[in-house]
Amino acid sequence: MPSVKVRDTEPFDVALRRFKRACEKAGVLTESRKREFYEKPTWARKRMKAAAVKRLAKRLSRENRRTTRMY
Protein backbone atom coordinates (compact mmCIF):
# COMPACT_ATOMS: atom_id res chain seq x y z
CA MET A 1 0.00 0.00 0.00
CA PRO A 2 1.51 3.33 -1.02
CA SER A 3 1.99 5.95 1.65
CA VAL A 4 2.41 9.70 1.41
CA LYS A 5 3.77 11.99 4.10
CA VAL A 6 2.00 15.33 4.21
CA ARG A 7 4.41 18.21 4.54
CA ASP A 8 3.74 21.10 6.94
CA THR A 9 3.04 23.72 4.29
CA GLU A 10 1.40 21.36 1.81
CA PRO A 11 -2.34 21.62 1.13
CA PHE A 12 -4.41 18.49 1.57
CA ASP A 13 -5.47 18.47 -2.10
CA VAL A 14 -1.87 18.22 -3.27
CA ALA A 15 -1.15 15.37 -0.86
CA LEU A 16 -4.29 13.56 -2.01
CA ARG A 17 -3.22 13.97 -5.63
CA ARG A 18 0.22 12.53 -4.80
CA PHE A 19 -1.41 9.60 -3.02
CA LYS A 20 -3.68 8.88 -5.99
CA ARG A 21 -0.68 8.96 -8.32
CA ALA A 22 1.24 6.60 -6.04
CA CYS A 23 -1.73 4.20 -5.97
CA GLU A 24 -1.95 4.31 -9.75
CA LYS A 25 1.76 3.54 -10.13
CA ALA A 26 1.54 0.66 -7.65
CA GLY A 27 -1.50 -0.78 -9.47
CA VAL A 28 -3.70 -0.94 -6.38
CA LEU A 29 -7.01 -0.33 -8.17
CA THR A 30 -6.36 -2.75 -11.02
CA GLU A 31 -5.27 -5.43 -8.56
CA SER A 32 -8.36 -4.94 -6.39
CA ARG A 33 -10.64 -5.12 -9.44
CA LYS A 34 -8.89 -8.28 -10.55
CA ARG A 35 -9.32 -9.88 -7.12
CA GLU A 36 -12.88 -8.69 -6.57
CA PHE A 37 -14.31 -12.04 -7.67
CA TYR A 38 -12.74 -15.48 -7.70
CA GLU A 39 -11.49 -16.50 -11.11
CA LYS A 40 -11.26 -20.20 -11.82
CA PRO A 41 -7.87 -21.37 -13.09
CA THR A 42 -9.47 -22.48 -16.37
CA TRP A 43 -10.92 -18.99 -16.88
CA ALA A 44 -7.54 -17.45 -16.13
CA ARG A 45 -5.84 -19.70 -18.70
CA LYS A 46 -8.55 -18.91 -21.24
CA ARG A 47 -8.13 -15.17 -20.65
CA MET A 48 -4.35 -15.39 -20.96
CA LYS A 49 -4.63 -17.43 -24.16
CA ALA A 50 -7.06 -14.91 -25.66
CA ALA A 51 -4.68 -12.07 -24.77
CA ALA A 52 -1.81 -13.92 -26.45
CA VAL A 53 -3.87 -14.44 -29.62
CA LYS A 54 -4.82 -10.77 -29.62
CA ARG A 55 -1.17 -9.71 -29.22
CA LEU A 56 -0.13 -12.00 -32.06
CA ALA A 57 -2.85 -10.66 -34.36
CA LYS A 58 -1.85 -7.11 -33.53
CA ARG A 59 1.81 -7.82 -34.25
CA LEU A 60 1.00 -9.53 -37.54
CA SER A 61 -1.24 -6.68 -38.67
CA ARG A 62 1.54 -4.21 -37.89
CA GLU A 63 4.01 -6.25 -39.94
CA ASN A 64 1.59 -6.52 -42.86
CA ARG A 65 0.87 -2.82 -42.77
CA ARG A 66 4.59 -2.08 -42.73
CA THR A 67 5.30 -4.23 -45.81
CA THR A 68 2.38 -3.06 -47.97
CA ARG A 69 3.36 0.61 -47.98
CA MET A 70 4.96 1.43 -51.32
CA TYR A 71 6.00 5.03 -51.32
UniProtKB/Swiss-Prot annotation:
Gene: rpsU
Keyword Ribonucleoprotein in record: yes
PANTHER family cross-referenced by the UniProt entry: MITOCHONDRIAL 28S RIBOSOMAL PROTEIN S21, SMALL RIBOSOMAL SUBUNIT PROTEIN BS21
Keywords: Ribonucleoprotein, Ribosomal protein
Keyword GTP-binding: no
Organism of derivation: Hydrogenovibrio crunogenus (strain DSM 25203 / XCL-2)
InterPro entries reported in the protein's UniProt record: Ribosomal_bS21, Ribosomal_bS21_CS, Ribosomal_bS21_sf
Any GO BP annotation: translation
An example Gene Ontology molecular-function term: structural constituent of ribosome
GO cellular component, one term: ribosome
Name used for this protein in its record: Small ribosomal subunit protein bS21
Family note: Belongs to the bacterial ribosomal protein bS21 family.
